[in-house]
Regions:
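Domain-level signature for proteins that mediate thiol-based redox and metal-cofactor handling
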Residues: 1-79
Length: 79
């Protein structure tokens, strides 16, 4: 089953380079998944898998740490 991974990022905060870098990493790790970038605002940086939010900068008050996105996706996709 192919999965859908979405990265929502704040344009005004200049999070696009961070989102694009993460998208490239995720496309390499999950070549069968569809990885999309969704421009938003309000300081958001969110990672969703198949419609389920797995990371929210707003909720946690921080950005992803290195390796965290892959760990979150591995955990979510193993269910």
């Amino acid at each position: 089953m192919a999965h859908w991974i979405d990265i929502a990022f704040c344009v005004g905060c200049n999070y696009q380079p961070r989102a694009a870098s993460l998208a490239a990493t995720l496309r390499e790790a999950y070549p069968d998944a569809t990885v999309t970038l969704t421009p938003t605002g309000g300081g958001r940086f969110e990672l969703s898998v198949d419609g389920t939010l797995v990371f929210s900068k707003e909720a946690l008050g921080r950005h992803l740490v290195p390796g965290e996105a892959l760990a979150l996706l591995t955990r979510q996709l193993s269910h």
